[in-house]
C-alpha cells in the first residue's frame, strides 16, 4: 500500500453455521469475554448523551488504564499521547474524585468527547468528525478512509454496494448502523474508540463493515469488511467468510521495507487472534 499511514490484511475462514446465524454472531459478538484480546469495556450506543459512557468508571485498575488516565490528566498542556482535536484538548477540567481506576474528571471528559463525536457522526457521517491535532498537521478521519479505499481496489470493488450505502462512502448513508464504543489496550496504554457496524444482503450472501471512526489511540480510522457466502460442510449449512482489514495509524507512517512487512505480519497475528476467539464463541 502506497498510503504511508495505511495497512491492509486479508483473511478467510469457515463458520459452521448458516449465513444469517453468522451475521448475528458478528453483530453481537462481545470481545471482552476473551482476555487475550485486551478489550476492557464494550457497549452499544443509542446517542442519548454522555451518560452512555459512564461505565468508564468500572474500567479495570491495570497499568494500561493507568497510563490512559495519566495521559488525560496532562491535558491541555501535553496532548501528545492522545488523539484529539484542538478544541477537545482544551475541554479537560482537572478536579477531585479518585474512586475507581478512572477518576471522575477523566470519565466526565471522555464522556463529553465521545458523546459529541457520536452526535456528529449520527447527524453528518464521517465528514462531520473533527480532525486530529498532531505535530505533523491535522488528520481527517474521512480522508483516511478514502485513502485506504483508494489503495485497496479489490475490496473497494467487492464491497461497493455496502460502501456506497453507508457513511464509509460519504455522507450519512442509507443503511442504519449498530453503534458501539470500546475501551481497549494499545501497546500498554488504553484507548477509547467509536464504531459503526453495517450489514447489507448482497446476492445469496451478506456484506458487513465495521467502521472505527474515532480512536483516542492505536488508529486514526479503520474498517473491517466481511463477505459472507453460504457453503456446505459435510452436508451442513456453513458460511465462508472473506475478511479485509484496512487501518490508518500514526505508527505506520515511518515504517519502510522490512519494518513495514513486520508490521503487516503483526497486524495479521492480531486479526487471527480475534478470528480464533470469534470462532470459539460461534461453536
What are these regions (language model features)?
Residues 1-283:
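Eukaryotic helix-grip
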Amino acid at each position: 500500500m502506497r498510503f504511508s499511514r495505511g495497512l491492509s490484511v486479508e483473511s478467510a475462514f469457515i463458520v459452521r453455521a448458516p449465513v444469517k446465524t453468522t451475521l448475528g454472531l458478528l453483530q453481537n459478538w462481545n470481545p471482552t469475554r476473551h482476555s487475550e484480546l485486551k478489550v476492557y469495556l464494550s457497549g452499544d450506543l443509542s446517542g442519548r448523551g454522555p451518560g452512555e459512557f459512564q461505565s468508564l468508571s468500572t474500567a479495570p485498575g491495570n497499568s494500561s488504564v493507568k497510563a490512559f488516565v495519566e495521559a488525560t490528566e496532562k491535558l491541555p498542556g501535553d496532548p501528545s499521547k492522545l488523539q484529539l482535536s484542538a478544541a477537545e484538548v482544551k475541554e479537560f477540567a482537572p478536579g477531585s474524585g479518585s474512586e475507581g481506576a478512572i477518576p471522575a474528571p477523566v470519565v466526565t471528559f471522555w464522556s463529553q468527547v465521545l458523546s459529541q463525536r457520536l452526535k456528529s457522526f449520527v447527524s453528518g457521517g464521517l465528514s462531520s468528525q473533527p480532525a486530529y491535532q498532531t505535530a505533523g498537521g491535522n488528520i481527517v478521519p474521512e480522508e483516511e478512509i478514502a485513502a485506504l479505499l483508494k489503495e485497496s481496489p479489490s475490496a473497494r470493488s467487492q464491497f461497493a454496494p455496502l460502501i456506497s450505502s453507508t457513511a464509509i462512502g460519504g455522507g450519512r448513508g442509507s443503511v442504519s448502523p449498530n453503534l458501539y464504543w470500546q475501551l481497549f489496550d494499545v501497546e500498554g496504554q488504553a484507548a477509547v474508540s467509536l464504531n459503526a457496524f453495517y450489514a447489507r444482503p448482497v446476492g445469496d450472501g451478506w456484506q458487513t463493515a465495521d467502521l472505527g471512526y474515532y480512536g483516542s489511540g492505536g488508529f486514526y480510522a479503520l474498517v473491517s469488511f466481511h463477505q459472507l457466502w453460504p457453503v456446505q460442510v459435510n452436508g451442513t449449512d456453513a458460511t465462508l467468510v472473506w475478511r479485509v482489514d484496512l487501518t490508518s495509524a500514526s505508527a505506520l507512517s515511518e515504517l519502510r521495507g522490512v519494518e513495514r512487512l513486520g508490521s503487516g505480519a503483526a497486524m495479521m497475528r492480531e486479526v487471527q487472534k480475534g478470528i480464533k476467539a470469534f470462532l470459539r464463541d460461534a461453536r
